[in-house]
Each structure stands twice: as structure tokens, then as C-alpha cells.
């Protein structure tokens, strides 16, 4: 693997960290360690979201950049007499990407390696072999011989189970493969926007936020937004890349490496037109590539944030990503860097007058 520079080291640390919804502590600590040098203060709300505040002007408009800390994973629900683990998915999973995948169970005594198993195809009927194994029929094998042995190792119902995958820089070093891009890339964007603004004069109060429990209903975004009361918000997340075999442009038109995605519509929100226009104008002026997209079957933290208090103009800016909600997703470094650049340039242009124009035009 290529030698990791400062950015790649941060991305590796963020994606290697383990944190399903409700269990984001490790990820929060990693994000805090990277964002704290660029913030005036860092706090955590009572649900667990990290809020890093950087003040440009004391009475300036509040700009919220939210990426969620949590990743899709699993939770221990039962231990069988023979020491196998029954589990619950936490976040959205597709059964076809799960079998024979390595996982890590995080217990009070330490981490335990397991593998997702099911009945072997060799003993299935020809009809059964043609069907996907249902998640309810899967289990996790940790090499225990009994329930007592698993308990002795520290495994308990409610323990977090996380996909295991090593952060990898591909042969084309712009292509990055890792677990949990959804949504550690959003956390990284929030960190680097605050990094860019550390020596920049601007009349805004900027909040870089790592929200919790996005994958189970945008829950942390709701409490964080109530805490901040933002005037403008950006949800930063992964989006769908439509550049692999079998996907038509009608289904997904974005391509990796062609710029961040500006989401005009998703299942949780109709994007704010004034904010969309301001972002597009900034991208055009700065020569930053971008792509439009709409996601009928998913949403981001913007969906919760825009409904806060008396309403918040919000826009999702996402990174085209292959194979999301699996053990190994892939994205393009240029898209990440251009997303950071775009949001930074937008914030530099914002002030109270501009925010009011965006909001009420």
C-alpha cells in the first residue's frame, strides 16, 4: 500500500474506528482529536453528537456542517447453546453482501473476531440454492464451543458488531477502499473545512458536527440542530456512484472523480433552492467540478436538520461512492478534496445579508 500522507492517515483513522448507531464513542474520540486544533470549543450533546464551534464573528450567522459518526453494523441478540451468535442488523443491509464476511465483536473484555455463516449450500435443495439466504437464518461463528465459553470471553446481548476491513489505497492512488466511508468521509469533510478556515477572516460561526444514529433515523442530527439552531446547514455524506457495470444513467448518473454531488432531492428533503443556487454559483466561479443527483430511496442528516425550529435552509453535498452499506466501499480522493474546497468557498461568501437573501429569495 502507498505511504500514507496526513490526509490519508486521518481517513484511515476515521474508517478504522468502530461505531455502529448508539456506540459511536471511539469514532467521536478520533474526530475530536483531529478537529479540536481548529475549533474554539468542542462539546458533546446528551445523545452523543460532537459539536466543534469556530467563531468568525460573534453575532454572525450559524453554519452547520454535519457528517454522521455511525456506520452500519450489527448487534448481538442471542448466544446459542453451542456458542454461535444470533444478531440484529443496525442500519440497512442487503443479505447478498453479508455471508462469509469477517466481523469484530466489541465486548467489555476486548475485541473478538467472528465470521458470518449459514447452512452450507452443499446440503440445500436445488431450489433453495437459487435463493438468497435470509438474514434471520445467518449467525456469527466466533470459534466458541458453548454459550458459557462465549460469555467467559465477554460476549453479551447488546454488544456492537462491526464489519472488518483494512483501509486500502488502490493501485490508482486516487481510489480509496475502506469500511465505513458512510459516513466517516462526511466527518473528514467537516474537519478539513474547519482546518481551511483557521486563518481565514469570515463573519460566520461555523459548526463542524459529527452526528450519531443517522443510520437508524437521523436521530443525532435532530438533537444537534436543536442545540446549535443553525441558519444554514450542509449534510455531508456518501452518495451513489453509477459508474459500475449494470447501472443505467437513469438509475444513477454520478461518476467517481467528477466532483461532489449536489443533491436536489432525496426521500427526507427537497433541497433548498436558494442554497443550491448559491453553491452552484460558487462552484462555477471557483472552477470546482460538481454533479447533480437525486436519491429517491435514501436521505441524509439534512432531512432532520431542515425541520429544526422554524426551518433551516439545507443542502446535502455528497461523495459518489461504490458499494455502500457493505464491508468495503470505494470513493475518489479528488471528490473529497473538491467537496472540502467547495464548502469552504461557500462559507467565505456567507454573511448575514447573504444568508437572508438565500433564505427568503
UniProtKB/Swiss-Prot annotation:
Needed cofactors: a divalent metal cation
Gene3D superfamilies membership: Peptidase M42, domain 2, Zn peptidases
Sequence intervals crossing the membrane: none
A Pfam entry, by short name: Peptidase_M42
GO biological processes: proteolysis
The entry's keywords: Aminopeptidase, Hydrolase, Metal-binding, Metalloprotease, Protease
Active site: 214 (proton acceptor)
Family (UniProt): Belongs to the peptidase M42 family.
Record's protein name: Putative aminopeptidase YsdC
Protein source organism: Bacillus subtilis (strain 168)
Lineage, uppermost ranks: Bacteria, Bacillati, Bacillota, Bacilli, Bacillales
Amino acid at each position: 500500500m502507498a505511504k500514507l500522507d496526513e490526509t490519508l492517515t486521518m481517513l484511515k483513522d476515521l474508517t478504522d474506528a468502530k461505531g455502529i448507531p448508539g456506540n459511536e464513542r471511539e469514532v467521536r474520540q478520533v474526530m475530536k482529536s483531529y478537529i479540536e486544533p481548529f475549533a474554539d470549543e468542542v462539546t458533546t450533546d446528551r445523545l452523543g453528537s460532537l459539536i466543534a464551534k469556530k467563531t468568525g464573528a460573534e453575532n454572525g450567522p450559524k453554519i452547520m456542517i454535519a457528517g454522521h459518526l455511525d456506520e452500519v453494523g450489527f448487534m448481538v441478540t442471542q448466544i446459542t447453546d453451542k456458542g454461535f451468535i444470533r444478531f440484529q442488523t443496525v442500519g440497512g443491509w442487503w443479505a447478498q453482501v453479508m455471508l462469509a464476511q469477517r466481523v469484530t465483536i466489541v465486548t467489555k473484555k476486548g475485541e473478538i473476531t467472528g465470521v458470518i455463516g449459514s447452512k452450507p449450500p452443499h446440503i440445500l435443495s436445488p431450489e433453495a440454492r437459487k435463493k438468497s439466504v435470509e438474514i434471520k437464518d445467518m449467525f456469527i461463528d466466533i470459534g466458541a464451543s458453548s454459550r458459557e465459553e462465549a460469555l467467559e470471553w465477554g460476549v453479551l446481548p447488546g454488544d456492537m458488531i462491526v464489519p472488518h476491513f483494512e483501509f486500502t489505497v488502490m493501485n490508482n492512488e486516487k481510489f480509496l477502499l475502506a469500511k465505513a466511508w458512510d459516513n466517516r468521509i462526511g466527518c473528514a469533510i467537516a474537519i478539513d473545512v474547519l482546518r481551511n478556515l483557521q486563518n481565514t477572516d469570515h463573519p460566520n460561526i461555523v459548526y463542524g458536527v459529527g452526528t450519531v444514529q443517522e443510520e437508524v433515523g437521523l436521530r443525532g442530527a435532530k438533537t444537534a440542530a436543536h442545540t446549535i439552531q443553525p441558519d444554514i446547514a450542509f449534510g455531508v455524506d456518501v452518495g451513489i456512484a453509477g459508474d459500475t457495470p449494470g447501472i443505467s444513467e437513469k438509475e444513477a448518473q454520478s461518476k467517481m472523480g467528477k466532483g461532489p454531488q449536489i443533491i436536489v432531492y432525496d426521500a427526507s428533503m427537497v433541497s433548498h433552492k436558494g442554497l443550491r443556487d448559491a453553491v452552484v454559483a460558487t462552484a462555477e466561479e471557483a472552477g470546482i467540478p460538481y454533479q447533480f443527483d437525486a436519491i429517491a430511496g435514501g436521505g441524509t442528516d439534512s432531512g432532520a436538520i431542515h425541520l429544526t425550529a422554524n426551518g433551516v435552509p439545507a443542502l446535502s453535498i455528497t461523495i459518489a461512492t461504490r458499494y455502500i452499506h457493505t464491508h468495503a466501499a470505494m470513493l475518489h480522493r479528488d471528490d473529497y478534496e473538491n467537496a472540502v474546497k467547495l464548502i469552504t468557498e461557500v462559507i467565505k461568501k456567507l454573511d448575514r445579508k447573504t444568508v437572508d437573501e438565500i433564505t427568503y429569495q
